[in-house]
Regions:
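Conserved Nudix-box catalytic region and its N-terminal flanking loop in Nudix hydrolases
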Residues: 29-67, 71
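Active-site-adjacent beta-strand/loop module that shapes the phosphate/pyrophosphate-binding cleft
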Residues: 85-120, 134
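Acidic, metal-coordinating catalytic segment for phosphate/diphosphate chemistry
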Residues: 1-24, 28-30
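A short coil-to-beta-strand element that immediately follows conserved catalytic motifs
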Residues: 71-83
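A structural signal for short, well-ordered beta-strand segments
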Residues: 25, 79, 105-109
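Short loop segments at secondary-structure junctions
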Residues: 29-32, 110-115, 138-139
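Nudix hydrolase/Nudix homology domain
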Residues: 43, 115-172
């Protein structure tokens, strides 16, 4: 798996307050558009955090089922890229500032999927923060990122990761 390090502020490991592990997936629909979401003003690929009892793939398959209502199998997804993102002065939900290391395992689905809106089970946080699914081409996603004027300061971090992913995709 290709490994990319984003560390614009040159943080050292000993400066990190918290390390988080997440997993996300590049899912394509029948039109070759990428399925992503807007959550609290941030554009993200489908996925989320890895719970203590889960493997990375198990967490991803659970998140796919919850967020788009589709059941995939371990064999339907393959490794794409690992991003280690050092985040200086990251604003937390309780209004404190932390230096984070976000390690995100990105996968790509070998299967085209269709969102099953009637099977989606969002968390209370996702409902509260206006979780919304979007289907767009890589070019359209880059425009969404460029024109995103959210007040959520975390959006810049997600934008950096999504740009790294889009650069590596072989679709327009």
């Amino acid at each position: 798996m290709e490994r990319v390090i984003i560390n614009k502020e040159k943080l050292r490991k000993e400066e990190i307050d918290k390390t988080k592990i997440k997993t996300r997936v590049i899912l394509l629909n029948e039109k070759n558009e990428i399925i992503l979401c807007n959550y609290n003003g941030c554009y993200l690929l489908i996925g989320g955090k890895v719970e203590k009892q889960e493997t990375i793939k198990e967490a991803l398959l659970r998140e796919i089922k919850e967020e788009i209502g589709v059941v995939l199998d371990h064999n339907d997804i393959k490794e794409f890229i690992l991003i280690e993102h050092y985040q200086k002065n990251y604003p937390t939900e309780n209004n404190t500032i932390k230096n984070n290391l976000l390690i995100t395992y990105y996968f790509i689905s070998k299967k085209k999927v269709k969102i099953k809106y009637d099977k989606i089970t969002l968390s209370e946080s996702e409902k509260k923060h206006n979780f919304k699914l979007i289907q767009a081409s890589p070019t359209e996603i880059m425009q969404l990122l460029e024109n995103n004027n959210t007040l959520n300061p975390r959006a810049v971090y997600y934008k950096e990761e999504l740009e790294e992913i889009i650069k590596r995709l072989k679709i327009k």
